[in-house]
Curated annotation (Swiss-Prot):
Gene behind the chain: FAOMT
Record protein name field: Flavonoid 3',5'-methyltransferase
Lineage of origin: Eukaryota, Viridiplantae, Streptophyta, Embryophyta, Tracheophyta
Residues binding S-adenosyl-L-methionine, per UniProt: V51, E73, G75, V76, S81, D99, A128, D153
Pathway: Pigment biosynthesis; anthocyanin biosynthesis
InterPro entries for the chain: Cation-dep_OMT, EF_Hand_1_Ca_BS, SAM-dependent_MTases_sf, SAM_O-MeTrfase
Species assigned in the record: Vitis vinifera
Length: 235
C-alpha cells in the first residue's frame, strides 16, 4: 500500500511516508507484506479496511507484552490484523476470528498458511452478535479471553462492548479500531462530509463518549492508524 493511501489521521503525506518507511515497513513480516500487497491488488480502494502497518506492529507488541494466548477478532476482511495477531501469539495460542464475508478472508489464507499459524485460527463465517451471544450462552468462554480486536460494523460497537466485557478477563484488553473515523469526529455537523463518514461519525462519537465515562474499563485513546481505543477491563 502506498503511503498516500495509508488510512490514518496524519494529514502530512511526508510525515506518513517517513513513519512507514523508517519504522514500519522494515519491521513488517514477509507474509504480512505479501498479504498487504495482495489486498491492494485484489480489493483496490477497500484495502483501506485493513489496519495500517504501524498499527499492526503496535498490536503485535501489545500482545507480546500481555503474554496473550487467547483472543477474538470481530471483523477480519483479508486478515492483516488477524495474521499480525497470530504471529504474536505463542504456538498454542488461539484466535476466534469472526466475519460474515469469507470470500475476502480467502485472500489472506495463503499467507496465513505460509506463516505457519493457521492452526491458531478458528474462522467463523457469521455476524459478530450471534457468535458473541453463543459464546456467552455456552458459558465456557466467559472471562477467558486476553484480548479482543473490534473492527466491524460501527453501529454495533456499543453492543459488542457489553458482550465482550463478559468474555474478556479482568486485566484483558478490548481494542476498538477506527475510533477517529478519518478525523470526522472532530468536525462540526455542518461541515461537508462523505455519506459514510457522516454515518460512522455518529456511532463512533457515541462510543468515544461512553468509553470515557465507563467505570468498568481503563481507557487509552490512541491516534494511531484511524484511531484505536484501548479498554482494559477493571472488574
Amino acid at each position: 500500500m502506498s503511503s498516500s493511501s495509508h488510512r490514518g489521521i496524519l494529514k502530512t503525506e511526508a510525515l506518513t511516508k517517513y513513519l512507514l518507511e523508517t519504522s514500519a515497513y522494515p519491521r513488517e513480516h514477509e507474509q504480512l507484506k505479501g498479504l498487504r500487497e495482495a489486498t491492494v491488488e485484489k480489493h483496490k480502494y477497500w484495502s483501506l479496511m485493513n489496519v495500517p502497518v504501524d498499527e499492526g506492529l503496535f498490536i503485535s507488541m501489545l500482545l507480546k507484552i500481555m503474554n496473550a494466548k487467547k483472543t477474538i477478532e470481530l471483523g477480519v476482511f483479508t486478515g492483516y490484523s488477524l495474521l499480525a495477531t497470530a504471529l504474536a501469539l505463542p504456538q498454542d495460542g488461539k484466535i476466534i476470528a469472526v466475519d460474515p464475508d469469507k470470500e475476502a478472508y480467502q485472500t489472506g489464507v495463503p499467507f496465513i498458511k505460509k506463516a505457519g499459524v493457521e492452526h491458531k485460527i478458528n474462522f467463523i463465517q457469521s455476524d459478530a452478535m450471534s457468535v458473541l451471544n453463543d459464546l456467552i450462552a455456552d458459558g465456557k468462554e466467559e472471562g477467558t479471553l486476553d484480548f479482543a480486536m473490534v473492527d466491524a460494523d460501527k453501529e454495533n460497537y456499543l453492543n459488542y462492548h457489553e458482550l465482550l466485557l463478559k468474555l474478556v478477563r479482568v486485566g484483558g484488553i478490548i481494542a476498538y479500531d477506527n475510533t477517529l473515523w478519518f478525523g470526522s469526529v472532530a468536525r462540526s455537523e455542518e461541515e461537508e462530509m462523505m455519506d459514510f463518514e457522516r454515518a460512522g461519525r455518529v456511532h463512533l462519537m457515541k462510543l468515544n463518549k461512553f468509553l470515557a465515562s465507563d467505570p468498568r474499563v481503563e481507557l487509552s485513546h490512541l491516534s494511531i492508524g484511524d484511531g484505536v481505543a484501548l479498554c482494559r477491563r477493571l472488574y
